[in-house]
Amino acid sequence: MVVGIHRPSKLVINAEAIRNNVKNEISRLDGHSELFAVVKANGYGHGIVETAQFTKQAGATGFCVAILDEALALRDAGLTETILVLGITDVKYAKLAAENDISLTVGDQAWLDEATQILNQKPLKVHLGIDTGMGRIGFQDGASFKKAADYLEQSQQFNFEGVFTHFATADEKDTTYFNLQVERFNHFISQLTRRPRYVHVSNTATSLWHAACNGNMIRFGVGIYGMNPSGKTLESPFDLQPAMSLESELSFSKLVQKGRSISYGATYTAEEDEWIGTIPIGYADGYERRLQGFHVLIDGQFCEIVGRICMDQMMVRLPKSYPVGTKVILAGKSGEKSITMTDIAEYAGTINYEITCGFTQRLPRIYTENGVVN
């Protein structure tokens, strides 16, 4: 992995914003609920270890990740809190997870049967996943779920730590399907002879707009990073503070004559003499080609991206001549104007956290406290 520290393009991560988002959500929970920080996918692009540390400082009592490798990275960083792997882990790594005190998601009896042949001394912590309508992983019928739960209660090789589901439409106005999933989940839970330590259903969207369903632990994900999971559909009950900015500088500036074209395919042609600036960032950094025609901020003014975005560079139309080294905001604030990840996502036809997850490791992550670099 090569990190581009010798060019001006970088991601700036506001640690205080991350902590404030977590603290604000914790303040809304009842006294019996915990917040686990979802730091999968490199902390949604913000840095997995750094984000975990910031959220722990703000009161998170555990972490959720997607794959075992992410959990092991947190352990290697010295984090000792509960870590739940939300995806299905190959059963051959059950012993490795147990040895590192990592909790795994289980979605069928066959996995438990095979793990029993592998585990020896240290019990494995497991959460049973229930498919109430996401259609992804988990038990689909009550009978198989109850069989697995009873099996865990009787086994010395497992610690039945939790049970959970995931909602497909918690970030939408229409709650019909959401309510159906709640009903199905409650039916599953009613079959337990004993509830495990954690009964959890809430992702960020559920915790923001359906707090009554929280259970005793919430999986707070995109909200950590100050992004609304519904985009602009639903209003957040508190101010989510964006944690990530994307900044660069002009690497080149030139006056282009009327009739000259810009970038691959010659898809943009100057209709008059124009100042064109080049920015050293491109789709290899996660700033996608489909953002042609969108804008950046320079000197508090929106400047259109002209021509196709290249792998490592892109061009913008300037209102006047600006010198090389002029600051460029691709996401964040400049003067009275701002560009949010949601703005970028809407133009690209996607969701805000796909944008942040897509920024590659070539972009340095710079962490700040109250505007000062750590």
Curated annotation (Swiss-Prot):
Query: Binding positions for substrate?
Result: R136, M311
Give all cystine bridges in this chain. none
Q: In which pathway does this enzyme or protein participate?
A: Amino-acid biosynthesis; D-alanine biosynthesis; D-alanine from L-alanine: step 1/1
Which reaction equation describes what this protein catalyses?
Answer: L-alanine = D-alanine
Q: Name one Pfam family in it.
A: Ala_racemase_N
Which residues are recorded with the post-translational modification N6-(pyridoxal phosphate)lysine?
K40
The molecular function terms of the Gene Ontology recorded here are: alanine racemase activity; pyridoxal phosphate binding
Under the cellular component aspect of Gene Ontology, which terms does the record hold?
cytosol
> What's the domain of life for this entry?
Bacteria
* EC number assigned by the record: 5.1.1.1
Keywords, comma-separated and alphabetical: Isomerase, Pyridoxal phosphate
Enumerate the cofactors the protein uses. Answer: pyridoxal 5'-phosphate
Quote the catalytic residue positions: K40, Y264
User: Is the keyword ATP-binding assigned to this protein?
Assistant: no
The answer to whether UniProt assigns keyword Isomerase to this entry is yes
GO biological process terms held by the UniProt record: D-alanine biosynthetic process; peptidoglycan biosynthetic process
What is known about what this protein does? Answer: Catalyzes the interconversion of L-alanine and D-alanine. May also act on other amino acids.
What protein family does this chain belong to? Answer: Belongs to the alanine racemase family.
UniProt protein name: Alanine racemase
> What is the originating organism of this protein?
Pediococcus pentosaceus (strain ATCC 25745 / CCUG 21536 / LMG 10740 / 183-1w)
